[in-house]
Amino acid sequence: MTKKILLASLFIAFSFSVNAQSWWGNNKKVKGNGTIIIEKRTTSNYDAITIGGSFDVVLIKGTEGNITLKGEENIIPLIETEISGGTLKIKYKKNTNVKTTRRMVVTVTVSEIESIALGGSGNIISKTELISDDFSVSLGGSGNIELGINADETNVNIGGSGNIDLKGITNNLKCAIAGSGSIRAYNLTTSEINATIAGSGSVKATVKNKIKANLIGSGSIYYKGNPKQIDSKSIGSGSIIEKN
């Protein structure tokens, strides 16, 4: 149980860290003026992306470092796009409380990405397949992520009520959910899956060889395919369910 509590704490901390500036403190309150503009920015290369805020982020294939923001003219200047340790961080400036009246869309070019993280209620969708030896995606909060991937090993983590939709191919899928989030990956074919669920979350995947699961609570794993081996430990009403 300690591992699950630690997982939940880590994601709560992640979500808090990227959104805290909008919750407390002497924040500057800004409401969108409704006038839509487009701004282009450039950065150095990155191999990871972290999003903090209620943005709609679209990933497209291209040379890294080209970012396009489409949104309200008085809101866009409050969005930071910076590189730190090889990670592109997109978030609102500190001490700002932003209320948009129009959709805020950030388009990011990618070529080789190893990690994606979202904190809050935003959305990330990839229009290109993400290819990596070792890929990870993390979601803290109620946001949504949709990705197409081709990776040897894929790590997926959710803390909260968000959803992650995956399609593509991976050899080894490792999942961890703390809360009511869902990993929807029937369109992702994996040789093996190792999943830990603490709460009422769910994992859906297509598995060829092996399923290993640790379930605490009412969370369940739904699978398609014909895995040769299924190992499960459960405390609560959670279960592994075939959906062929």
Task: Kindly give the residue locations of the regions a language model identified.
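Intrinsically disordered, low-complexity terminal regions
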Residues: M1-N244
